[in-house]
């Protein structure tokens, strides 16, 4: 059964990643109304008779979301049953399921009633939490923490501050990026790093949205760089923290490069999807570091208790 659960965890993680990228594809191609205002049917039909490209994209996104719902539910039930001895399993299972249902309902509401861009931008963030929760469940199932000896990990307050702070802030950056997509502001500023050669500062809403995201992205790049330097200096003996921050910096660098290329490639579809891919992976890595941070407190208490008993 454990072999089956491992395969299920991998497939579920990939399916949720496809859901995330599919949502970005729907937004990028303007396919949100590809099935009209009907849900769960498509243009009032179980199998649509007229298959435009927008309809195919929207219908494919709905199908992958539906399959993800089934897979996540099954994974939550099995992990709850067979891995309940792991402290985080129940919490992650609940988060995976609840946020997947929330994003599905929000997606359906957007189709039927429509939503403002500021509300639609939350949709991607909700999906991201479900994805990260499933990734963490997968790590627990594959016992990644044991392989890196994470159960004995103890971090200082400074490192935990950076882990929690960067993760929370990254969610804000994700929201600003999703808002750029939903406000159709990807090309509002044709130059980089300033808005344009003639107008370095933004003058209207779409430009403010775009520049706000750029500033937020620059700050998270600098923050992760600083945290990585701390990890390299002080956590070489803790490979999970050491490599966690190095991988985070690689991902945020790729994210930044692709973000610039989005501007200079006229917001090409490939760059837009890569932009969503890298931030999804980055958020998952940061969430894993958060899980390690919560364990660190427990590990420190256990170490202190053991030390007292020894004395």
Curated annotation (Swiss-Prot):
Lineage summary: Bacteria, Bacillati, Bacillota, Bacilli, Bacillales
Family statement: Belongs to the COX15/CtaA family. Type 1 subfamily.
Written domain comment of the UniProt record: The N-half (TM1-TM4) and C-half (TM5-TM8) domains are connected by an intracellular loop. Each domain is formed from four-helix bundles and they align in a pseudo twofold symmetry manner. The N-half domain is the substrate-heme O binding domain and the C-half domain is the cofactor heme B binding domain.
EC annotation from Swiss-Prot or TrEMBL: 1.17.99.9
Binding site for heme b: 213, 275
Pathway as given in its UniProt record: Porphyrin-containing compound metabolism; heme A biosynthesis; heme A from heme O: step 1/1
Subunit structure: Interacts with CtaB.
PANTHER family found in the cross-reference section: HEME A SYNTHASE (PTHR35457:SF1)
Catalytic-site annotation from UniProt: 58
Catalysed conversion reaction: Fe(II)-heme o + 2 A + H2O = Fe(II)-heme a + 2 AH2
Organism for this UniProt entry: Bacillus cereus (strain B4264)
A single GO cellular-component term on record: plasma membrane
Membrane topology: Multi-pass membrane protein
Entry superkingdom: Bacteria
Keyword Transmembrane helix applies: yes
Topological domain ranges for the Extracellular compartment: 28-62, 113-121, 181-211, 265-271
Listed cofactors: heme b
InterPro entries for the chain: COX15/CtaA_fam, COX15/CtaA_HemeA_synthase, HemeA_Synthase_type1
Official protein name in the record: Heme A synthase
Segments crossing the lipid bilayer: 7-27, 63-83, 92-112, 122-142, 160-180, 212-232, 244-264, 272-292
A molecular function GO annotation: oxidoreductase activity, acting on NAD(P)H, heme protein as acceptor
């Amino acid at each position: 059964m454990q072999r089956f659960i491992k395969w299920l965890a991998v497939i579920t993680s990939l399916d949720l990643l496809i859901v995330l990228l599919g949502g970005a594809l729907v937004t990028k191609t303007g396919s949100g109304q590809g099935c009209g205002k009907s849900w769960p049917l498509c243009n009032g039909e179980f199998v649509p008779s007229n298959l435009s490209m927008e309809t195919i994209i929207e219908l494919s996104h709905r199908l992958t979301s539906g399959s993800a719902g089934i897979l996540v539910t099954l994974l939550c039930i099995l992990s709850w049953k067979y891995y309940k001895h792991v402290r985080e399993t129940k919490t992650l299972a609940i988060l995976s399921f609840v946020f997947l249902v929330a994003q599905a309902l929000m997606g359906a509401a957007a189709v039927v009633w429509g939503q403002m861009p500021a509300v639609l931008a939350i949709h991607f963030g909700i999906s991201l939490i479900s994805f990260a929760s499933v990734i963490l469940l997968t790590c627990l199932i594959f016992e990644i923490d044991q392989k890196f000896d994470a159960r004995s990990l103890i971090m200082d307050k400074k490192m935990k501050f950076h882990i929690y702070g960067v993760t929370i802030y990254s969610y804000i950056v994700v929201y600003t990026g999703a808002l750029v997509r939903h406000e159709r502001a990807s090309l509002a500023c044709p130059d980089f790093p300033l808005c344009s050669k003639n107008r370095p500062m933004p003058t209207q809403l779409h430009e403010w949205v775009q520049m706000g995201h750029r500033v937020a992205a620059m700050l998270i790049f600098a923050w992760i760089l600083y945290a990585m330097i701390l990890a390299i200096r002080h956590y070489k003996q803790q490979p999970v923290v050491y490599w966690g921050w190095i991988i985070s910096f690689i991902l945020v660098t790729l994210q930044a490069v692709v973000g610039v290329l989005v501007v200079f490639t006229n917001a090409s579809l490939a760059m837009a999807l890569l932009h969503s891919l890298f931030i999804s992976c980055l958020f998952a890595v940061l969430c894993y570091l958060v899980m390690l941070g919560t364990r660190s407190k427990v590990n420190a208490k256990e170490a202190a208790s053991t030390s007292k008993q020894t004395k």
